[in-house]
Amino acid sequence: MPGATAVGITYAGGVILASEKRIAYGNFLVSKNTRKTFQITPYVGAACAGLVADMQILSLQISALAKIRKMDLKRDIPPNSVAKMMSNMMYERRFFPLLTQVIVGGVVGEPAIYTLDSLGSVLPDEYAAVGTGAEMALGVLDPQFKSGMSEKDAVDLAVRGIRSAALRDSFSGDGLDILALDANGAREIAQAA
């Protein structure tokens, strides 16, 4: 599976999803500006690691399903429902899996994140990292995460985690995409490379 690093962090009132921008296959650097963080609904997003085509099709299909579900229910779809829809789609393809790991996060009520593997296992947590740089990122997140931290602290922690991974993982690097989700919706946070 191609490498990448993505992290998700809950904070007081919201969720930060972040990913780096590099795509590399073996020794070949394919792109330095690839989006691996996606807005699924106005209040839910996903950060992915793995094959970019699989990330893109999964996020587009789940976004469409979430819009249909919202019209049916006449209310916003919470992150756990988006994660479950994604899990079902990934499990249906278990014999020809989508080669991606995903962190789904958002705020409809309380902030929440869920980690999914390529077969659709759903694991809730307060913070997570996926991809080939996950071990290095978790080495930063584990000792420094504090429940109820501020948005600024969560963004800083996400940046430190991904930068730590990029130092040791040749499949990660070339800048960051950061998506903040709170009760007001999703917004991108500008970040220097």
Swiss-Prot record:
Listed GO biological process terms: proteasomal protein catabolic process
Example of a GO cellular component annotation carried by this entry: cytoplasm
Regulation: The formation of the proteasomal ATPase PAN-20S proteasome complex, via the docking of the C-termini of PAN into the intersubunit pockets in the alpha-rings, triggers opening of the gate for substrate entry. Interconversion between the open-gate and close-gate conformations leads to a dynamic regulation of the 20S proteasome proteolysis activity.
Propeptide stretches in the record: 1-4
Catalytic activity, EC: 3.4.25.1
Subunit record text: The 20S proteasome core is composed of 14 alpha and 14 beta subunits that assemble into four stacked heptameric rings, resulting in a barrel-shaped structure. The two inner rings, each composed of seven catalytic beta subunits, are sandwiched by two outer rings, each composed of seven alpha subunits. The catalytic chamber with the active sites is on the inside of the barrel. Has a gated structure, the ends of the cylinder being occluded by the N-termini of the alpha-subunits. Is capped at one or both ends by the proteasome regulatory ATPase, PAN.
Name this protein carries in UniProt: Proteasome subunit beta 1
Naturally occurring in which organism (per UniProt): Cenarchaeum symbiosum (strain A)
